[in-house]
Amino acid sequence: MTINYQFGDVDAHGAMIRAQAGLLEAEHQAIIRDVLTASDFWGGAGSAACQGFITQLGRNFQVIYEQANAHGQKVQAAGNNMAQTDSAVGSSWA
């Protein structure tokens, strides 16, 4: 009996997570544009409150990006490790 694992699917999933992390930058910029459009709420685009909000938003997006990218890397590494182990075990049975 042969068991076929789709390790490429695991790698592709990890790559997708990392790609989605990269797409966060475009979303971040869109939110900043919206914040600047509504900057009167904070007292104007140059106000300390508006700039502080934008800074905090940037920090939050950076943390999310780093975590998503790291998770994608771990998923890809796990898939690669499983594939290597499977290959080693499979060749020892031949």
Curated annotation (Swiss-Prot):
UniProt induction comment: Differentially expressed under different growth conditions. Highly expressed in sputum bacteria.
Main location: secreted
Subcellular location: Secreted
Keywords assigned: Secreted, Virulence
Protein transport listed as a keyword: no
Entry GO CC: extracellular region; peptidoglycan-based cell wall; plasma membrane
Knockout or disruption consequences: EsxKL deletion mutant shows reduced intracellular growth in primary human macrophages. Also shows growth defects in the absence of host cells.
Note: In BALB/c mice, immunization with EsxL-FIA induces a pro-inflammatory response with elevated levels of TNF and IL-6, along with low induction of IFN-gamma, IL-2 and IL-10, but no induction of IL-4.
Assembly and oligomerization: Strongly interacts with EsxK to form a heterodimeric complex under reducing conditions. The complex is regulated by the redox state of EsxL.
Protein name listed in UniProt: ESAT-6-like protein EsxL
Native source organism of the sequence: Mycobacterium tuberculosis (strain ATCC 25618 / H37Rv)
Name of the coding gene: esxL
